[in-house]
Amino acid sequence: DKAYRTESVRHSFYDASSEAVQEVITHLQETDGQAFKDAIDDLYKAFEEFAKDPSDTVNQNLVLQKASLFLSRAKAVQTGFEDYQRIINSKIIEDIDRVNAIGKEMVDLNKRIQAIEAAHVEKAMNLRDQRDLLLDELSGLVRVTNYEEDVNGVLHIDIEGAEFLDEVTFHEIGALVDKKNEFVTPYWTHLSEPKKDYYYPVFDLEAISATTGSDIGEIKALLLARGDDWCDYRDFYDDVTGKYLSSDNYEKGIANSTMMNSEAELDTLIHHLAVNVNNILSPIAEVGEIYTNNQTISYV
């Protein structure tokens, strides 16, 4: 049973991760019936024609038209990414509610099983089957790090190393809401002190690997895919130095989030394109300097 549950819940983790990747691909491949790549190609071709005769109003208008179309499609993709983050967030809330509902049901089953089997005359097999099914479902949502039955027939469960179910009750998982974007973070209510603004997180999202067996559970995968915020090109830079993130910091940061990384990459494309075009058409630095030093120059 343990081996089956381990593989089953690992599948839940990667299935949820795969869905986010597929969503990104879908938005890039088709926006209003046209691939986003086509909008980039059309803009490139428009500039090719413009370069042949910049004074031609037809070429000028074509650039304006294709640039406007590119920006509108880019905005649609970006909005699609952010909307999907909200969808993931709603799913996380649903999953947290389901985990708590399972905990409540298991408390009831524990008590009923204990009452029936107290005399050591009969086994509450039907109730045990129900409890096993709930354990399977729970294992698909979160990483059950330990579960065992005591001599009284009561099942004890730990989630992510913290006690979830004991002989008396279950410990509820709360959802801390970010006021900026309304993204939720699961936390242990019994280990937190809200009055002191201290919330004990259920999941450690910085140390996930197949080697340690921490790549388990749908909620964790959804949290990673969603990330903790919306992103733009600035998220590839270090807040202190202003330079590009080191590969190590990148891997520990937004690289773990499918949606945040995709948003930052898309915005980087738009940013560099806009800056380079403006630096060519209305530069405040020599054009040769832009190309020679591969700079991102401010513009007016």
Task: Label each region the model flagged.
Residues 1-300:
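Structural signature of extracellular appendage/secretion-system components
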